[in-house]
């Protein structure tokens, strides 16, 4: 979270771009690429080292390892172009994703959901918050947060920003969460003894232990413990505008 705080301090309090895609266009993604199972950047950290395409890397001391949870045990042959790494077994490039209710988008993406243009200083729309893709708008009906000062409710100590994402749901770096209908769209991780790491807007981090003692599954939730976990996460993702 220190890197995020430094970024917002340099960018008029705006969160970095967090669009609902894996674009690698310079200047339009806090963390570019598709790092999920089978994704082209699953074992290729190169894009994470490009400060124009992964806008937090300069605030992380150019250490791409900080995008990955050490408990994520995926390993495979390197997929990038660095001659020193070609043919070597490397860990997965990324585990972390950002709350889709947090961050900014550019006017081009806001208009098309497919291309990027203009300055990314619009709040994200939270495209999955209603359970129907692209139905939610900024603060209509669910809150989204384009600046650090926007938080509340949820309060900064309750609003999660980064999460360990399960590799089965990992694709782009924006974590999709619905606030209605008790279902998992993307999957929070279980890397820490069936617990998941979260970083919150106030700067603190914690490992939340799930009541449902197994990996999350995409789709409708039927187990009461799993629903309790979903309720906890929704309460820390967004809030309905009153």
Where are these regions (language model features)?
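Short, well-structured segments within or immediately adjacent to enzyme catalytic domains
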Residues: 1-242
